[in-house]
């Protein structure tokens, strides 16, 4: 039986984001800078990750509490061995209406068919530039944008619905906005531009690196005729715009200039098995893995999940100032543990 639960600000729980690994094959500066995540960096050992059975058990209980959507993240989730088996298990959960995956796309040709056969239908690909030299500078692994574009084409060809996410940094890749809109408009693939956020401790964020929604729109409107699109559902994070000469759309995710904390319905499970109520969480998180491995029953887990959501009052982006950023520095969980 489903229950309706709300947090302290009246927000229901609708989404569960699961990080299945803290590892990644890219070293993007805004997430896993190579100076910190070098060859000698120690990632989580296999036994510290939640098993697929544990993740499925958790997801079943969250579905009873109102979760309808699950997104699989990382790190890079396609590095998790046999990920399609998790998708198969999640697809059997009553009440889960949508399962998505966020990936850098590099391994889609290798794993895409198995994932599609397991029931995955929606993929978000993180691609921060369309020009090879710009993209190589960002990912620090000499991976060309053209390589990822080929992977996207493959994913579309076997039936996936693909969206593209682009984190925009001033002076780094803001010159990619127009060519990316132009390219994906012709492919009829939604591209979403994300304001650079202060996630984690190590990405060197400050306000001066942010290209705001208004700045992006000013750029875009010099090249395209567009009109706004009404939100599709409560809690939608992207603000969408449609081209007047086609049905193609693009989105802007404005977590800095126009935050959306008031409608956030996401619970997050980190790669080391901890619950977080916010992408910018500065706490240690609640150790779900320890609870499970110490013999908790489903009723025990359900009671804890209800409690954690009922006391949730996170609204970091609504209150973001340089002072709050400084106060939380070195306390926030890094993106490779909690996903984007």
UniProtKB/Swiss-Prot annotation:
Pathway: Cofactor biosynthesis; molybdopterin biosynthesis. GTP binds at residues 17, 71, 102, 163, 266-268. Residues 8-229 form the Radical SAM core domain. S-adenosyl-L-methionine binds at residues 30, 75, 126, 197. It is an enzyme of class 4 (lyase). Keywords: 4Fe-4S, GTP-binding, Iron, Iron-sulfur, Lyase, Metal-binding, Molybdenum cofactor biosynthesis, Nucleotide-binding, S-adenosyl-L-methionine. Its cofactor is [4Fe-4S] cluster. CDD domains: Radical_SAM (cd01335), Twitch_MoaA (cd21117). Signal peptide: none annotated. [4Fe-4S] cluster 1 binds at residues 24, 28, 31. Its EC number is 4.1.99.22. One of its GO terms (molecular function) is metal ion binding. [4Fe-4S] cluster 2 binds at residues 261, 264, 278. It catalyses: GTP + AH2 + S-adenosyl-L-methionine = (8S)-3',8-cyclo-7,8-dihydroguanosine 5'-triphosphate + 5'-deoxyadenosine + L-methionine + A + H(+). It comes from the Bacteria. GO terms for biological process: Mo-molybdopterin cofactor biosynthetic process. Binds 2 [4Fe-4S] clusters. Binds 1 [4Fe-4S] cluster coordinated with 3 cysteines and an exchangeable S-adenosyl-L-methionine and 1 [4Fe-4S] cluster coordinated with 3 cysteines and the GTP-derived substrate. Belongs to the radical SAM superfamily. MoaA family. NCBIfam families: moaA (TIGR02666). Monomer and homodimer. Catalyzes the cyclization of GTP to (8S)-3',8-cyclo-7,8-dihydroguanosine 5'-triphosphate. HAMAP family: MoaA_B (MF_01225_B). This is GTP 3',8-cyclase. It comes from Staphylococcus epidermidis (strain ATCC 35984 / DSM 28319 / BCRC 17069 / CCUG 31568 / BM 3577 / RP62A). The gene is moaA.
